[in-house]
Amino acid sequence: MRLDVLIAAWNEAARLPGVLAALAGHPLVARVLVVDDGSTDGTAEVAVAGGAEVLRLGVNGGKTAALARGIAALQGEHVLLLDADLTGLRPEDVTRLAAPVLARRAGASLSLRGNAPGLWRALGVDYLSGERVLPLALLQELAPALPGLPRFGFEVFLNRAMRARGMQVAVVGWPGVASPAKAAKQGLWRGLRADAAMIRDILRCQPPGELLAQIGWLRAQIARQNLACSASAAVVSPMTRPSQTPTPPQPTTNPSP
């Protein structure tokens, strides 16, 4: 079983090559599709040079709209969603994120990056993570609703759908992977405005009570995951138990008369 990779990118020519390098030749990757969301910095050309298929959008419509266009073009059974600006991504990170889903231990997986906000790292989950493995069928089912979402409402909308379906989710640590802050990419004030717009979109998409419920649900998923790991470690196979061969009786000697 292999993955289709979907990446929405807007003006990521500087960082996209590192992401594509981690995917090149990966045995679990069947196809890489980059949706160029109206970039003006040569992102599409960089994607082609990195071996990806490219779907070019003439106007920047935001991440949700770009992903909706990409989902319509995919055909595989499972999809790996990746942000275009990741740094430090390695092939083994891709393998570890895919493993719980491909082994059918979970219905979906999401990453916890090394530079995720401190609160998310303390909780052990980033509910806004853009790096996920999940069934294409779920994304296709949700696709008709995506055009009505805010530009940055995709992740929390997806969380709600997975929670409603009772999906089991695995959280995979990516300590060496980072996603730069918007202020680092766009400058301080533009970055702060972009962060504020993202928060506004998230709250427009899902109310605060639902967001808290999503975090609690994912925390419960982590507890289930940890319990399963502990139970697995506690099982000792009969083939690995130490030998318990009984000690033969020692001969006795009669005392001399």
Where on the chain are the PLM-derived regions?
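Short, well-formed alpha-helical segments that are part of the catalytic scaffolds
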Residues: 11-25
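Short aromatic/hydrophobic "clamp" motif used to bind/position activated sugar donors
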Residues: 79
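Cell-envelope/extracellular polymer assembly enzymes that use nucleotide-activated donors
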Residues: 2-4, 157
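A conserved acidic beta->alpha catalytic loop
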Residues: 36-44
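Conserved donor nucleotide-binding strand/loop of the catalytic core
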Residues: 44-73, 112
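Conserved donor-nucleotide/metal-binding helix-loop-beta segment in metal-dependent transferases, i.e.
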Residues: 91-112
